[in-house]
A protein has these predicted regions:
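N-terminal leader/targeting signatures
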Residues: 1, 9-11, 182, 196
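Gram-negative bacterial Sec-dependent N-terminal signal peptides
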Residues: 3-21
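C-terminal and inter-domain tail/linker signature
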Residues: 22-278
Length: 278
């Protein structure tokens, strides 16, 4: 009886461990699931909804919480919706994607998903209208390199961006910009931005507006893989509460490229869930 019990216990342990191992996805598998789920907004294919966990937390303030909110969005997207993922990377349980949308009009967006095992359990995003034209340096919000490289430098590049935000963006030490950014090879994709300048240094477009207020107040997440690092922050833009998603490409421990999406955070009485933007 003891031997039989031991065999049964070992068998159950094997099944349990096997199920746990089966639930773990590789970074490539997570990326594939996110790409497929995003594409379902265009195709209205409901099968990718199986990737979503029952505890799914939604931070898009215009979408209802839980799996039901995503299902409704897939079933009834704005007419003519298209989704093309331009850049995507995985960082632990997170996958971050930069997307070219037609979603009630041409838009650019970042989507961030958190996995628990093989299920997607949380989502953040930021969406912005496409620029009417390329910026003063001739760049769009999406062009530029897309390949993830320098995988061995992931941690160092994330730390670089943390220090940059601590020192320069939040700390206001503008004299330290040169420590973090290429002086003559920084490609800027912000609608009003110019190469070799940050928003703090730009004086054209909306940045030239009298009384213009542009301020970061808090960094919520720093995600990265290889040469790409995404910083998710909040602050004020044109004196309005704003979510900032800034994507940087790092080369030789310097910022060499920047893409961003800015979205005004609506008043809480307009939210369709109570989870907050971050």
């Amino acid at each position: 009886m003891q031997k039989r019990f031991t065999v049964c216990a070992l068998t159950m342990l094997s099944i349990t461990c096997g199920a746990a191992l089966a639930a773990q996805l590789t970074p490539a598998q997570r990326i594939d699931r996110v790409t497929t789920l995003l594409k379902s907004l265009e195709t209205r294919d409901l099968r990718p909804l199986a990737y979503i966990g029952s505890s799914y937390t939604q931070h898009n303030l215009q979408v209802a919480d839980g799996p039901a909110g995503v299902r409704e969005l897939v079933l009834h997207p704005p007419a003519g919706t298209t989704v093309h993922t331009v850049r995507i990377f995985a960082d632990g349980d997170y996958v971050a994607a930069q997307n070219d949308y037609n979603f009630g009009g041409p838009k650019v967006g970042f989507d961030v998903f958190r996995f628990d095992g093989d299920k997607i359990v949380e989502h953040w995003d930021n969406l912005q209208d496409k620029c009417a034209a390329p910026n003063p340096s001739g760049r769009t919000q999406l062009d530029g390199p897309t390949k993830v490289t320098d995988f061995d430098k992931t941690d160092a590049n994330k730390l670089l961006m943390k220090r940059y935000f601590d020192d320069v963006v939040l700390g206001g030490q503008r004299d330290k910009i040169a420590q973090y950014r290429s002086a003559d090879n920084f490609h800027q994709h912000n609608c009003d931005g110019e190469d070799n300048k940050s928003g703090f240094q730009t004086k054209t477009g909306i940045f030239a507006k009298p009384g213009f207020v542009f301020k970061y107040t808090k960094v919520h997440k720093i995600l990265g893989q290889g040469n790409f690092v995404l910083v998710m922050s909040e602050g004020l833009f044109d004196a309005k509460p704003t979510a900032f998603y800034d994507l940087y490409r790092i080369e030789n421990s310097k910022q060499v490229e920047h893409w961003d999406v800015l979205e005004t955070i609506p008043p809480s009485d307009q939210w369709k869930n109570s989870n907050g933007k971050f």
